[in-house]
Amino acid sequence: MADPEGTDGEGTGCNGWFYVQAIVDKKTGDVISDDEDENATDTGSDMVDFIDTQGTFCEQAELETAQALFHAQEVHNDAQVLHVLKRKFAGGSTENSPLGERLEVDTELSPRLQEISLNSGQKKAKRRLFTISDSGYGCSEVEATQIQVTTNGEHGGNVCSGGSTEAIDNGGTEGNNSSVDGTSDNSNIENVNPQCTIAQLKDLLKVNNKQGAMLAVFKDTYGLSFTDLVRNFKSDKTTCTDWVTAIFGVNPTIAEGFKTLIQPFILYAHIQCLDCKWGVLILALLRYKCGKSRLTVAKGLSTLLHVPETCMLIQPPKLRSSVAALYWYRTGISNISEVMGDTPEWIQRLTIIQHGIDDSNFDLSEMVQWAFDNELTDESDMAFEYALLADSNSNAAAFLKSNCQAKYLKDCATMCKHYRRAQKRQMNMSQWIRFRCSKIDEGGDWRPIVQFLRYQQIEFITFLGALKSFLKGTPKKNCLVFCGPANTGKSYFGMSFIHFIQGAVISFVNSTSHFWLEPLTDTKVAMLDDATTTCWTYFDTYMRNALDGNPISIDRKHKPLIQLKCPPILLTTNIHPAKDNRWPYLESRITVFEFPNAFPFDKNGNPVYEINDKNWKCFFERTWSRLDLHEEEEDADTEGNPFGTFKLRAGQNHRPL
């Protein structure tokens, strides 16, 4: 049988709704709405045709009611999500919506619709003059200017940022303070400045000239200019270990723990914290464990302190300013600063009296001694290397403070060249080779040199005899020539020997100058690489006595002519000069060794026969007697050196008082 019209089930259709309402009315004792008359006689006439037995109208009513409830719930949920987001940035009240209005369920659909809402009941709004932000940034105790920024909403409502909205109870019913339909009047909302760090950071970010504003606030807060403590780095990628940082708008809680947060990254820290109109201002002198660029430092501090990189001033400190060093020293021993780690040496040097006395006196002889010991003769190398010693050497620091650095540098280079030239002239060839061996580390092997000579079909005994006469400067044996095809290792072999013995290289390209032979005046051995036909013709015409090893006259620039015995000369060429009829007078003056085979390399491109300074040292030590290299016993000093130690300053007697 078909089911009768209507239904006897509970909680379904329209009967379910009225049944639940009836139970609530009978059992809970809720107050009856004002639109119903309690004294009226119930005749039942108002219930005629109240329930439509047609299923179409029941379904339509149920669908419309569900849609209205769903819409109201979605609007309320969206308002809560938007409220949380706006509360984070605007510090709004938890009871107010982001638009400053309270959402209500539209009661026009049914007088009882609000009572069966699935959401929790509305709480009463409380009067709060000052809201406490819990966004994580904390509040600052420093007074800040009150800023009210009002923006027209989409429906004409007022949206306030940078402050909280005061919820005021005017005695009306709940939910009547505002609505979401946008038809209410746009009333002025009073904003009370929360004086929180996030609002203060917004003020700083709104400033057009942030750099100038931060410098001005720093000077007002600390009483001195930030530029008095730092020097300027134009590039953000220049690395340095010491940095001075001024950080604005820091959370007070985070500022208190900054010392602990920064400790794993630094060797020394000097931290000061004061309040400014933008929050807590941190001034810190940091020495990192390794060199860092400004970008790296800013990114690290921004991560630790939750402050934008644009709210920081980061520059390296002044390392030679007594005023800056004294500021760090005096504030470091006071209770305004927190200091950890060893004090940087530049602060100690500028604040200790003895260092100040030592830095004020520059001794040129000490600089010359340093350049002589380090075998420096170029002025640029001297200036750079000596400036690097300023942190540890008081004389170098005094050199940097002097206004006559260029004069001192030129005098030092000149004196060093004179001493070096005189020392070399006083040594014979044996002493000079021994001196060069003393400057080279151990660990060489003489076998690659011998194997390379055998590879080029050169008898080792013959080569030793020629080298012996060559080093002694024997007449007619004063010139060695390595000839052969290209890529046979002639220049590689000759240049390695010249590098070991610190000889001079002359180039025929400068032969048009009168001074192209001037390097021969300050060397023990000379070399000319890749002599051509024109070069051999020049030697045959003008330099026969030089190849003989006899005294020659050499013109020098800005100096008079000098007469000296020509040092041994080593030449490489692709031409066999002894077999060419154009130079018959050179055959008796040169000793020629042919290199017929191409120089070998392994599969990695490295030379099979490695010839370097260590191998040449081992070679001369091995063939010392065969080359007839002897030293007199009195040439060595008390410490066993092959020559006396050169000292420009008298020894100091260090004895206690």
Swiss-Prot record:
It catalyses: Couples ATP hydrolysis with the unwinding of duplex DNA by translocating in the 3'-5' direction; ATP + H2O = ADP + phosphate + H(+). The keyword Isomerase applies. GO terms for biological process: DNA replication; viral genome replication. Its main location: host cell. There is a cross-link at residue 565 (Glycyl lysine isopeptide (Lys-Gly) (interchain with G-Cter in SUMO)). Keywords: ATP-binding, DNA replication, DNA-binding, Early protein, Helicase, Host nucleus, Hydrolase, Isomerase, Isopeptide bond, Nucleotide-binding, Phosphoprotein, Ubl conjugation. The modification Phosphoserine is found at residue 110. Residues 147-444 are annotated as: SMARCB1/INI1-binding. Disulfide bonds: none annotated. It holds the Pfam family PPV_E1_C. It is found in: Host nucleus. A motif (Nuclear export signal) lies at residues 109-118. Residues 458-608 form the SF3 helicase domain. ATP binds at residues 484-491. Residues 175-188 have a biased composition (Polar residues). Can form hexamers. Interacts with E2 protein; this interaction increases E1 DNA binding specificity. Interacts with host DNA polymerase subunit POLA2. Interacts with host single stranded DNA-binding protein RPA1. Interacts with host TOP1; this interaction stimulates the enzymatic activity of TOP1. Interacts with human SMARCB1/INI1 protein, stimulating viral replication. Belongs to the papillomaviridae E1 protein family. ATP-dependent DNA 3'-5' helicase required for initiation of viral DNA replication. It forms a complex with the viral E2 protein. The E1-E2 complex binds to the replication origin which contains binding sites for both proteins. During the initial step, a dimer of E1 interacts with a dimer of protein E2 leading to a complex that binds the viral origin of replication with high specificity. Then, a second dimer of E1 displaces the E2 dimer in an ATP-dependent manner to form the E1 tetramer. This is Replication protein E1. It comes from Human papillomavirus type 18.
